[in-house]
Amino acid sequence: MNLESLSSFMELSKNFRHKSVLEKRQEIKSFLELSYKDFFYNNANEDFLFNMIENYIGYLSFPIGIVKNLKINGKYYSLPIATEESSVVAALNFAAKILENADLRYSLGEVLGISQIYIKSEKDLSKIFVDLGDKIKTWIEPLLTNMNQRGGGFRRLSTRHIKELGIQKLNIYVDTCDAMGANLLNSIAERVAEFIFLEFGYECVLKVLSNDISEFTAKARFVLDFKHLLPGKEDSWNLAKKIELISSIGFYEEERAVTNNKGIMNGITGVCLATFNDTRALEASVHKFASKSGKYFPLSKFYTTDNALVGEIEIPLQVGTKGGVISFNEASILSFKIMNVNSKSEFIGILSCVGLASNFAALRALAFNGIQKGHMRLHVNKILHLLKTKYNISDFEKDKLLLEMERMNIYSFDFAFKILKKIRLENENKV
């Protein structure tokens, strides 16, 4: 399918949430001009999966939900989120409505991949290696034909001597265009290591990519007028001040910062799972960046001006929109079609905004009426579904269970099952 033939965004209907699963699929299919035969998350190509990993025995199903009409840089996006956590998609949809008038925007500079070679040397070779740029570019040219054609390729190098280990580190920075480029970066490291040995006789003890891209970050920001936070002006100001205070706690308490950043990654990791991006590399780099000062800090901050709540985030995002499994897996291909993303830089920007929106939704809930109210409503739905499937509960029993869970403020399957047994025992005694 030609993505350029799509309109600038896929604006889903206002009542999308209330449609059946089949109706939701049909609406998206009609936007994407997919036929009834086209893949839509509800099956798997096991032949493909078999060849992805060793000892394949099956696949794990994750629910995929849609965040609809999140306005980013003036354009609306519908985003697929793969997650097991009940409230992630609901919270992001809620945030999308509020932030529609907040001018949510991202900005980013270059994003480069890094090949690393660690060379055994008691001597500091920095002066020699810093002048190797042209030679290294020639050495790796055969590997970069496709990247050069797309405007990418070798960009620069850096080096430093680790005296304590007797090791010289060499970093090679490469623009991998729309790919994450893991295989390419590893190949470059191995090729350069071979030439260093042949040219200089130095043993290379390690040659591999780095998953740390903390020097290449995306920034996102919104400015939300108080009037869009809550209906009442005074209430909105108070809520914004609470959000500001909760946000600041993470800068003094690492325990809070960890939880704050987990909330940011809820949305980001969900989109990356839906697109078959490497979530381990992504999160490793993000958390390293959060601790770059020697202390673990929040990736985001929220503060107030005279009439608005401002949210900001800075985050490194190592992802791709092409290459590897991404280009061949049907689920990944469909996810990118739904988003109508045209480049890796656009995808990185979207992810930074998704992280900020996820964080905003969580902080607003914490400041307003606690995180459990919305989350538990969805969690209870799961419990009731399981009870319906296993024990065929009636509508009467369902209502009684809901009342009792709310009264006791206990939302667990074990507690619900205990109450169900009590209800049924009471009914038996009445008969």
From Swiss-Prot:
It is an enzyme of class 1 (oxidoreductase). It comes from the Bacteria. The active site is at E85 (charge relay system), D278 (charge relay system), H375 (proton donor). The keyword Oxidoreductase applies. GO terms for molecular function: hydroxymethylglutaryl-CoA reductase (NADH) activity; hydroxymethylglutaryl-CoA reductase (NADPH) activity. Keywords: NAD, Oxidoreductase. One of its GO terms (biological process) is coenzyme A metabolic process. InterPro entries: HMG_CoA_Rdtase, HMG_CoA_Rdtase_bac-typ, HMG_CoA_Rdtase_cat_sf, HMG_CoA_Rdtase_NAD(P)-bd_sf, HMG_CoA_Rdtase_sub-bd_dom_sf. It catalyses: (R)-mevalonate + 2 NAD(+) + CoA = (3S)-3-hydroxy-3-methylglutaryl-CoA + 2 NADH + 2 H(+). Pfam families: HMG-CoA_red (PF00368). Pathway: Metabolic intermediate metabolism; (R)-mevalonate degradation; (S)-3-hydroxy-3-methylglutaryl-CoA from (R)-mevalonate: step 1/1. CDD domains: HMG-CoA_reductase_classII (cd00644). Its EC number is 1.1.1.88. Belongs to the HMG-CoA reductase family. Converts HMG-CoA to mevalonate. This is Probable 3-hydroxy-3-methylglutaryl-coenzyme A reductase.
